[in-house]
Design a protein with these regions (language model features):
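Long, compositionally biased tandem-repeat segments
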Residues: 1-384
């Protein structure tokens, strides 16, 4: 096996993992020192062996210092799995300057050329609190299943955005990364979830599911991030099924709005299409909307994916999100999100047969209490 890389001193990157020779695993990358990147994982053996795991990025140290990026996972040779990417480091908090950004997650390594799964992408680091919030790091791309047989790696999740203690805006949350493509035979990897938005901040969108190549199902899309006092983020699209056989992946659900009187639920991701034989993926559900002074709307559901050209049903549309409950006098509840459209039927099938079902609309939010001003007349008072 290749040797492991050393950890970096403060502010210094971690060392790369050593490659294997003919048979053996690649070494792991070393962790980055404060605010520095992690080292890359070593390459797996050319005949057999897994790629090494990437090192984690170092957390920021000192007011407003960003976290380091995660190291990339090492690729496999002929037979073996790719190494996972390292996680990004968290940013450092601050008072009179902006909080530090979270580091990016490292990409997963590719699977073996004959057999092996791709490595998972690392997760993004969390943005820090400051006068302006730090941005959350994006997740790392999932590694591809490159060979005859292998599943794509899952995409990394986005990091949470940092909150703010002053007029500048909160930090934007990190995006979920796309899942890796499947090998000649194998499923696509799932997309990563988007990061949660800080209060009033932009939430991260979900990553797309990876596509299958010849035989296999598309990966599911990642969920959109939740937020408060701002919109929920959209879910990621499902990956396409294999060119010969396989279902499309389901779309990720939209992010919810958990508090506040602004913002609507995120849209559900669209389902992936089947190509020749297989069913389309279901659309993701729209995000729900929590209570507000005036009820806001739930998110729309995603459309279903198309059925295969030779055989397969279209995917069902995703249901709409729940509308928000209104509070206070005379306020109106939010509207439920629209359901997604069903996916298309195969072109040769009889009209209407094989199409996906449309998603149901989301429930409407409840209304606020009736006004008590001016006070109502007593029931015993005669009315002229």
């Amino acid at each position: 096996n290749g040797g492991n890389g050393g950890s970096g001193a403060a502010g210094q990157a971690g060392g790369a993992g050593g490659p294997a020779g003919l048979i053996g695993h690649g070494g792991s990358g070393g962790a980055g020192g404060s605010g520095a990147a992690g080292g890359a994982g070593g390459h797996g053996g050319w005949l057999w062996g897994n790629g090494g795991v990437g090192g984690s990025g170092g957390a920021g140290v000192g007011a407003g210092v960003a976290g380091g990026h995660g190291g990339a996972g090492g690729a496999a040779g002929l037979w073996g799995a790719g190494g996972g990417g390292g996680n990004g480091g968290n940013g450092a908090d601050a008072n009179i300057v902006s909080g530090g950004d979270g580091g990016l997650g490292g990409a997963g390594g590719g699977g073996g050329w004959l057999y092996g799964d791709g490595g998972a992408g690392g997760h993004g680091g969390q943005g820090a609190i400051g006068l302006g919030g730090g941005a959350g790091g994006d997740g790392g791309q999932g590694g591809a299943g490159r060979g005859l047989w292998g599943t794509g790696g899952a995409g990394g999740h986005g990091g949470q955005g940092g909150g703010t203690g002053g007029p500048p805006l909160p930090g934007q949350a990190g995006m979920g990364a796309a899942g890796g493509a499947g090998g000649l035979i194998g499923n696509g990897g799932a997309g990563g979830d988007g990061g949660v938005g800080a209060s009033g901040g932009v939430a991260g969108v979900g990553g797309a599911g990876g596509n299958a190549m010849l035989i296999g199902h598309g990966g599911a899309g990642g969920a959109g991030g939740d937020s408060s006092f701002a919109n929920g983020a959209a879910g990621g699209a499902g990956g396409a099924g294999g060119h010969l056989f396989g279902n499309g992946g389901s779309g990720g659900h939209g992010g919810a709005v958990t508090a506040g009187n602004t913002g609507i639920g995120g849209a559900g991701g669209v389902g992936g299409d089947a190509r020749l034989i297989g069913h389309g993926g279901a659309g993701g559900a729209g995000g729900d909307r929590a209570g507000a002074l005036v009820g806001r709307d739930g998110g729309p559901g995603g459309n279903g994916g198309a059925g295969g050209q030779l055989y397969g049903n279209g995917g069902d549309g995703g249901p709409g999100g729940q509308g928000g409950q209104a509070f206070g006098a005379n306020n109106i509840g939010g509207t439920g999100g629209a359901g997604g459209n069903g996916g298309a039927r195969p072109p040769w099938r009889e009209r209407g047969e094989g199409g996906g079902r449309g998603g149901g609309g989301g429930g409407g939010g409840g209304g606020g209490s009736f006004s008590t001003f001016p006070p109502p007349r007593p029931s015993s008072t005669p009315v002229a």
